[in-house]
Amino acid sequence: MRIIAGSRRGHTIQAPKGLDTRPTSDRVRENVFNIVAPWVEGARVLDLYAGSGAMGLEALSRGAEAAVFVESDPEAVRAIERNLEKLGLTGARVVRHDVVTGLGQESGAGRKYDLVLADPPYTMTDYHSLLRYLPGVLAEDGLLVFETAAKVEPDLPGLAVRTSRKYGSTRVTVFEHP
């Protein structure tokens, strides 16, 4: 995997070992950032189910002001930390918690994000635990990018679908406040 654009363009990034992490492909990542490009420069980014951190790292490379990576897997957390160090990116914080706990902490602290990137496991079908916090951490004019299996059409009450696109076995749905 590599950073596609921005100040760290072409630099490789490390994915955690094992089968528990499914990194977003370069093609999907490039298309996502084409969609959200106007929101990235100077943005506060929240990368949920961060895995390797590829999405948040891409945002930082493209000019995001800050990124918070939420990931529960210890090997993935180490990969994110190594990638941040290797790329020399600043303005990042890694939160080692399950996503619901991490979201609760961010929401409880009153933190708002311009761009929220969520890539839950494709086997996940119940998003109700996320619904409690997602709308609350999204800035008024912010976007939520939600990656799922192509057959899933997520519906997040309190948020409106801006666009939804399929890329092979992946669906990317972009939400905003109505």
Predicted features along the sequence, with ranges:
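Class I S-adenosyl-L-methionine-dependent methyltransferase catalytic core
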Residues: M1-P178
